[in-house]
Amino acid sequence: MRIGINGSSLISTGASLAQIVDHAAVADAEGFSSYWLAQLAVPDALTAIALMGARTSRIELGTAVVPTWARHPLMLAAQALTTQEAIGNRLVLGIGLAHKVSVEGTLKIPFATPAKHMDEYLSVLMPALVDRAVSFAGDIWSGEMAGLTSPAAAPGVMVAAMGPRMLRLAGERTDGTILWLSGPRAIAQQIKPALDQAAAAAGRPTPRIVASVPVCVTKKPDDVKGMVAALLAGYNDLPSYRGVMDAEGVGGPADVSLIGSEAEVLAGLQSFAEAGTTDFSALEFIVDPDDAAPTRALLREAATAG
């Protein structure tokens, strides 16, 4: 299992674009396999990743994830290919549906037929990226374009998927899934079997599974878990997340996080690996500044051990 860094928490703490790029550069220098950034409000994740290209040399850079409702797939393809060229073909384009509350509350777009939405979105996006041409007419998304020229290789595409229909789409048509707050039991018993079956039926390689949860090496686990529970309480009310947490047998986000001693966090990482996770994207959740160094040291050792 490869170990990467999820830098998305920097956005919610008000980090500048320069600080986020610096964070990715350090992850590259320290030997982590990948660096992931969510598309929230600002900054634009793909633009930030394009800037990371000049400060990094080998690390894989990915979006985790770009919500699809606000961007036409042809426009996203153009932006992804531009970013891919800028960073030397190291991009993974992670996309996802987001949630009814954010799509309807912020974008004022009806969150209707989400699985069909993603199916049609991929029907435009994938040929645009791979074939550089698309001709598709759907009920939600359509595209007609030829001659998309770019020297960049097609980036890998992954879909945030936890339920059966989305896992089938991810397995059949993309490189895998990107997960948040999904634990080892849910991955082993629910996510990986459905994803692998769909990929095999479509004649595709075994898919990647990128899992991300809060991580902290600390002597005060109850304090950190309490903060995780408070800050991430909203996920308890989102059906897709509630479903995977129920499958995990946990009460909430704090229970699936890796928070505790070095031995406890290492055991948690091993559980993710044994469940079939191919990539673990650690979101370093630091409450006490004294926990930052031991958390990063453990993750760095795990990342470079193999």
Predicted regions and their residues:
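Active-site-adjacent structural elements that line small-molecule/cofactor binding pockets in enzymes
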Residues: 1-306
